[in-house]
Amino acid sequence: MNGWLLDTNVISAVSGPKPEARLATWFKAQPEDALFLSVLSLAEYWKGIEHLPPGHSMRSKHQQTLLRLENRFQGRILSVSNAIALRWGMISGEVKRITHHSPSVIDTMLAATAIEHGMYLATRNATDVAHSGAAVFNPWKDDPANFPL
């Protein structure tokens, strides 16, 4: 695999004041150039900021975190290409056919991004993308030794 596409829940957890030990250990062990974000995760993070009322004490802190993420991952923030959009359509349609439920757009877009870039999708929401065909790694539960780069 070519690296790790980090889901928003992973980004939020490692950016917090006290990330869980297992997650922090895994994250720190990864080569920086193997860690990637999707522009969709940045949008989700921004959405979370916008949920906070204007003047909320945490707004500024989260805005600063988002800026640090954009700077840290510069050159490793993946956009949504035509190939990713088409892959998402295939995944979304197949998952709905199999499960009779519409999957989360963002989660399946991240799965499509990981597939198109040959990456693992690092997420806590493994069940949400179980039928996507993506190689999914849950850093809270899975053994990293089973997911070689």
Task: Give the predicted meaning of each segment.
Residues 1-41, 50-68, 143-148:
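Short, well-structured N-terminal submotif of metal-dependent ribonuclease cores
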Residues 10, 41, 84, 110, ...:
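Alpha-helix capping/helix-boundary segments
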Residues 7-8, 45, 66, 88, ...:
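Generic structural signal for small/hydrophobic residues in well-ordered secondary structure
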Residues 13-14, 26, 48, 87-91, ...:
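Residues that scaffold the ATP/ADP-binding catalytic core of kinase and kinase-like folds
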Residues 47-52, 71, 75-120:
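Active-site neighborhoods of divalent-metal-dependent phosphate/nucleic-acid chemistry enzymes
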Residues 2, 26-28, 68-69, 77, ...:
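Short secondary-structure boundary/capping segments
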Residues 3, 109-111, 115-149:
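Acidic, PIN/NYN-like endoribonuclease modules and their adjacent C-terminal/linker elements
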